Amino acid sequence: MPNSTIALTFDFDALSVWFGYPNTTPAMLARGEYGARVGVPRVLDLLQIHHLPATFFIPGHTIDSFPHAVASILEAGHEVAHHSYAHIDPSTQTLDEERHDLERALDALRRIGVQPLGYRSPSADMSPATLGLLETYDFRYDSSLMADDFRPYRPRIGDRVSQQEPLVPGRLARLWELPIAFEFDDWVHFQFNFNPYRNGTSAPSKVLEIWIAELD
């Protein structure tokens, strides 16, 4: 495998990952708490062993619920970025709801001394207003979209798309896009749950094969 530059990012959703479904039974919430109790310490240990920096996208709800886990991320020197307040898909919100959610999460981040440069949308989706709001609040980058694989690009605001007419491109946003890909998301491969059903029982060796092939 040739030398590659890799951006390591972690979505520390904890309990909030279930709010958008919604599915907040004790069993599901316990699975979310696993991230704070077990997942984050193990990830931080691994990053320290290999001297790797990373970015953690953290909902405000997680910041307020698990302050010690979030503090350990900051103490280790990693970037903390915006990931909404309660992990609700922005495409399901009104403009006022989305703005309130964005501001509430910013308040949570500022309480721990973070003025975020980056944003990642919950559920890997956006409303037509999301990128414009990110500009208004002076974000430098987004990491939610998939119009490229490894190269940063500037996303567009105000595209017009319909079944009857070809794409009419909007203007370039002032912020940069650091694209994501579902095949690199461990949730897709490993998370098993009944409701909504997700058969996340992949063999780690198979997932590693996929990731190495993508990097090659």
Predicted regions, residues:
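Feature marks short, surface-exposed loop/turn motifs that line or immediately flank catalytic pockets
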Residues: A14-S16, T62, I88, D149, ...
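An active-site-proximal "capping" alpha-helix that borders the catalytic cofactor pocket
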Residues: E98-I112
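Short, well-ordered coil/turn segments that N-cap beta-strands
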Residues: P2-I6, H50-A54, E75-E79, R110-L117, ...
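Active-site-adjacent pocket scaffolds in enzyme catalytic domains
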Residues: R110-V114, R120-D216
